[in-house]
Amino acid sequence: MSMRYGGYRAVLQWALLLSLWLASGFALAQPVSTAQASANPQAGNRTVLVVGDSLSAAYGIAAHEGWVALTGQRLAARVPAWNLVNASISGETSAGGAARIVSEVVRVKPAVVVIELGANDGLRGLPLRDLRRNLARMVGASQSVGAKVLVIGMRLPPNYGQAYTDEFERGFCGIAQLLHASCLPFLLEPIARDRTAFQDDNLHPVASAQPALRDHVWPALLPLLD
């Protein structure tokens, strides 16, 4: 989690985006289920399960345009022995994910689980010990069925206070390292400094930005597909 995505100017740009995010009422606050398969499951194939919030649920764009669906398409083309199931829910917090993770892994029986949750926790200023506990529960439940896990993190603007933002950022890869899971520190790394990459709500990436997110996640996911 020590990686940085730019200098002071980049921090200000990201802070502006998230300030507008909060000012808009934070659209992720209304949970909407978007569970879907990104490819037609094939008998005998192994499955990647994605559990996330609206950043993974293709909020505001067609489902097939989101980075998760694009990853499913790439799997079908390059690693056809794998399926992808997207169980992301707009508005989800880590507590919501932790509450449903057992039923999801029992239902899907994944070989790999991608966890992209925590943004809502941080933007609402929720206790970070709860975020860490919920992440640990999700990782543990996934590993209990034999799945490998990729945790995808987020970052917060500096106006939340240095101590809170630093602890928030460290939590994702900290839990992953503790539980021997993989970690990608920041989902929005390749687009965070580009306001044109976001929808009018200044919060959700546009369709044209989704391939960059897929390409960012892919190198972290690929080693788990052995």
Give, region by region, the residue ranges found by the protein language model.
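Acidic-and-aromatic substrate-binding clefts and catalytic sites of carbohydrate-active enzymes
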Residues: 91-95
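Alpha-helical cap/lid subdomain in secreted, periplasmic
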Residues: 6, 74, 80, 98-226
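Serine-esterase "nucleophile elbow" of acetyl-processing enzymes
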Residues: 30-90, 100-109
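N-terminal non-cleavable signal-anchor helices
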Residues: 11-12, 18, 33, 62, ...
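Bacterial N-terminal signal peptides that target proteins for export
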Residues: 2-15
